[in-house]
Swiss-Prot record:
Record's keyword annotation contains Ribonucleoprotein: yes
Protein name from the UniProt record: Large ribosomal subunit protein bL33
Molecular-function GO terms, alphabetical: structural constituent of ribosome
Family: Belongs to the bacterial ribosomal protein bL33 family.
Gene3D superfamilies (UniProt xref): Ribosomal protein L33
InterPro entries per the UniProt record, alphabetical: Ribosomal_bL33, Ribosomal_bL33_sf, Ribosomal_zn-bd
Lineage: Bacteria, Bacillati, Bacillota, Bacilli, Lactobacillales
Amino acid sequence: MAQKKVALACTVCGSRNYTIDANPNRTDRLEVKKFCKYCGKHTLHRETR
């Protein structure tokens, strides 16, 4: 099955700053610390579906 595009949203402000290719068969949501240009700092970003 092909990879599916999902967005990574900032947990602080809620903006969707990054898109990634992810396997749709995973049950857990990806969590990564990345830079949010709206908050101006590194924050936790979670996968949205």
